[in-house]
Amino acid sequence: MRGIRTNGWAKLAGFSLLAFCAVLLGAGLFRALRGAPAETAPKFKFDPDWPKPLPNKWKIGGITGLAVDKDDNVWALDRPNDLTDIELEAELNPPIADCCKRPPAMIHFDKEGNVIGSFDPPQGHGMAVDSKGFAYIGNVDHGIGNVRKYDEKTGKLIAELPHTPEMPPGGGGGDGGALTSDHVAGHGGAGPVAGFIRPVVGGVQRAQPSPEAQVARQAAIKAFREKYPPTTPMIVGGIEEVRLDEPAHELYAADNYLGGRVMVFDLDTFAFKRGWGAYGHKLSEISTDDKDREYTPNGPMPKEFRGHLTLNVSHDGLVYAADRMANRIHVFTRDGKFLKEFKMAEWTAVGGSTGGVMFSPDKEQRLLYISDLTNNHIWFLNREDGKILGQMGQMGENGGQFFGLHMEAVDSKGIIYTGEVFAGQRVQRFLPVK
């Protein structure tokens, strides 16, 4: 009898335990044992009410920089020289149309989309804003590539990074431009896509440099690289991106020299601290042979960065460098130690797929948001392993579509702001959908 009673109590206890576990499972407390739910891409909806119409008959140019400040207001760096004569007819005296006029290169929007400030630096590429009210702009001014620090409110130039007195032959000057005060009223440029027309269209070969001119150019490039080797501790090529790591008092610049160099400077003194290339190559190890930068879509990855390098720094101190022309992202420590390589949309040719790098707004920054200039998507990647979770957007000129998706920024609430070049030439906003 004693044994039977003991067995009965054991069965009762077993049933109770099973029931208790069922309750726990129903409450979701055993999810960790069953495995966490699969990460999914976030959803967003286009906000047609942001921004408000621009004042002063301005028409914005292509967006080459985008940043959100500590108050979740938005700074947009645009390229007024993208505008053509037909877009500047209100500047003529007398005007021959109701619109439009050249805008300043830097425009400040509040959360409601109103313009609350502006100033007019030489147009550039890449920007960041700090918590003290300063803007850092990568630009090309009179053939010199650099990063300049400005007072956001007054537009006063405060300081600039050390840079060479000249740029590589034929490289990096496309984002330069005069101030509005130097602009001839009513006279625009060739348009935002003129420099991107491929040499062969419809089987017709467009004009190419003569063999003699090509030989002379290669000789000039070789001489320049001997004068300014990869170890040059200053900005040499055009700037593609600027990022700040304020806790570490450091500024990161993506220098497009030799396909791309990650260059780190002291945020307070602008003194050079360190730099590296693809796969964590020391500056002294970066190749000057262009064959080491060659890339064919779906082919092997080049030994060095291919070009149009952008970057960002996560809260946990990892540096994500997007090599757009090679459809890949490299992950480093702050000291340049190579950790991982993520490949994305490797079939993409022309302008490449891996553009700007942003992070999801959660504390862990679990996701990467990658802007894609060529395919006109924002890709959502798992930050840990680079797995593509989804995408947003398609090519088009309607609201919520993209034509030349170039820049992105994310505010503290997870709202995505985008900026376009080419025929897009606008900023848009996308609200998270829960």
Question: What does each model-identified segment do?
Answer:
Residues G8-L17, L24-K434:
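Eukaryotic scaffold repeat domains enriched in small/polar residues
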